């Protein structure tokens, strides 16, 4: 029940924030709403072709803040933070995997495939329902709905 309420709240926030991002040519990567020691925080992670600057974050923060004040979906005070997802961003959607084709990722699954729950390899192929990793000289195809967490591996 609690999870259902959170998902409805998350959906409502996304319905407010995503059109604003799209209007100004940004991609809404993720939303995070949580209680921290200094109070409630709404984090909005954005991206765009060429990357996100501090000025982009400030600009979009102002636009989002105005709309949230009008729609008022959060019944108490909170801090709004708008930022880039960073190099270690989670991959959540098909287009996230497509954008990082050929790059190395760590994927943790909800349930085992081939006796394993964790895989590390390069993104080889992405289709509507799965991602295929190249691991050394072999390949493993993972259904997107079975992915618990997927993160880019940043190599320097």
From Swiss-Prot:
Main location class: cytoplasm
Which keywords does the record carry?
Cytoplasm, Ribosome biogenesis
Alphabetical list of SUPFAM superfamilies matching this protein: YhbC-like, C-terminal domain, YhbC-like, N-terminal domain
Entry's Gene Ontology BP terms = ribosomal small subunit assembly; translation
**Pfam families referenced in this protein's UniProt entry, alphabetically:** DUF150_C, RimP_N
Q: Which domain of life is it from?
A: Bacteria
A single Gene Ontology CC term: cytosol
- Is Cytoplasm among the key words of this record? yes
- Where found? Cytoplasm
Residue ranges of coiled coil: none
The cross-references to InterPro entries, in alphabetical order and at most eight, read:
Ribosome_maturation_RimP, RimP_C, RimP_C_sf, RimP_N, RimP_N_sf
Q: Which family does it belong to?
A: Belongs to the RimP family.
Protein known as: Ribosome maturation factor RimP
To which species is this protein native? Dictyoglomus thermophilum (strain ATCC 35947 / DSM 3960 / H-6-12)
């Amino acid at each position: 029940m609690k999870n259902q309420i959170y998902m409805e709240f998350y959906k409502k926030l996304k319905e407010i924030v995503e059109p604003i991002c799209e209007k100004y040519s940004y991609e809404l990567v993720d939303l995070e709403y949580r209680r921290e020691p200094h109070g409630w925080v709404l984090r909005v992670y954005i991206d765009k072709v060429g990357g996100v600057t501090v000025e982009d974050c400030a600009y979009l923060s102002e636009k989002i803040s105005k709309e949230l004040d009008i729609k008022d979906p959060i019944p108490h005070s909170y801090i709004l933070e708008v930022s880039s997802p960073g190099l270690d961003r989670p991959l959540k959607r098909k287009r996230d995997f497509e954008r990082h084709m050929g790059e190395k990722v760590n994927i943790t699954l909800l349930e085992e495939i081939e006796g394993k729950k964790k895989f590390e390899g390069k993104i080889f192929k992405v289709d509507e329902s799965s991602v295929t990793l190249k691991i050394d000289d072999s390949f493993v195809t993972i259904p997107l709905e079975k992915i618990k967490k997927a993160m880019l591996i940043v190599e320097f």
